[in-house]
Amino acid sequence: MAHKKAGGSSRNGRDSQSKRLGVKKFGGEAVIAGNIIVRQRGTEWHPGSNVGLGKDHTIFALTAGNVNYRTKANGRVYVSVMPKAEAAE
């Protein structure tokens, strides 16, 4: 006969891989067209000017410039890219 009762297996021990969400380019940072600015689930940040919104709600730059975050009166944060000035004088 067994001297000890069989130990039950734990029901824990599983976890999903992190999805690496969040802001990738912060305010004032330079970006080029195609750079990912924010990875998100749903629209925590909303697209402004010169940015696109992917089917997974990724916000990406459409033109080269600097990233700008702006909170409007409705409480939503809008992400835009301010194009760089043309050739410096």
Swiss-Prot record:
GO molecular function: structural constituent of ribosome
Top-rank taxon: Bacteria
Keyword Ribosomal protein: yes
Disordered, as annotated region: 1-21
One Gene Ontology term, aspect cellular component: cytosolic large ribosomal subunit
GO biological process, one term: translation
Classification via SUPFAM superfamilies: Ribosomal L27 protein-like
Record key words, sorted: Ribonucleoprotein, Ribosomal protein
Family that this chain belongs to: Belongs to the bacterial ribosomal protein bL27 family.
Record HAMAP family: Ribosomal_bL27 (MF_00539)
Protein name: Large ribosomal subunit protein bL27
